[in-house]
Amino acid sequence: MIFVDFASSVLHAAFNALTTALRTQTVTDSLSTSDPRGALCRLGERQAERYLKRLGYIIVGRREKIWRGDIDLIAVDGRTVVFCEVRTRTDSLHGHPVETIGYTKQRRVSELAAAYLRKHHLGDCHARIDVVAVTLHGPSGRPLVEHYQNAFDSPP
C-alpha cells in the first residue's frame, strides 16, 4: 500500500510539473493578419479558448506546431490532456462547422496528438480529442460555441 501511495504521489508531482512546463511555452501565431480566413480561424479559436477556460480547462498550447501540422488548442482538464480541433463558421447557412471534419482530418489530428504526446514524453497520460464548433452569428446574434468531448478516436 505504501508503494501505491508513493507511485501515486510521484505521478501527481510529474503531472503538476508538466502542466507548469506546458503553461510557460511560447505561443506563436503564424497566420498573417491580412488573411481573412486566418482572421476568422483566430477569432473562433479565441472564442473556444474563452469557453474552455470558463469550464475550468487550463490552456497550455495554441496553434501548436507538431510534425507537419498544428493543433488548434491543447488544454488540461483535470488529469487529462485535451487536444481541441476548433471549427469556425460565420453562420450556419452552409452547414454546421463540425460537418467539415472528415475522416482524413480526424486521422490527421489523432496522429498529431500522438506525436505531441511522444515529443513531450506523455505516453502514460490520459488524452482525448475534443471538437469546439463556433458559429459567429448564432440564432441569438451572439457567437454560438458547442463543445464535443471525445469527438473521435484519441491517440493510441
PLM-predicted stretches and their roles:
Residues 55-63, 82, 89, 146-150:
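Secondary-structure boundary/capping motif
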Residues 67-69:
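Short acidic/glycine-enriched loop/turn segments that link adjacent beta-strands
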Residues 60-61, 117-120:
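Short helix-to-loop capping/linker segments positioned immediately adjacent to catalytic or ligand/cofactor-binding
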Residues 52, 71-93, 109:
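Conserved catalytic cores of phosphodiester-cleaving nucleases, focusing on short active-site segments
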Residues 5-6, 119-156:
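Domain-level recognition of nuclease-like catalytic cores that cleave nucleotide substrates
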Residues 90-116:
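Mg2+/Mn2+-dependent nuclease catalytic core
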Residues 3-5, 10-62:
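Acidic-basic catalytic patches of nuclease active cores, encompassing PD-(D/E)XK
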Residues 63, 87, 130-132:
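Solvent-exposed beta-strand sheet faces enriched in polar/charged residues
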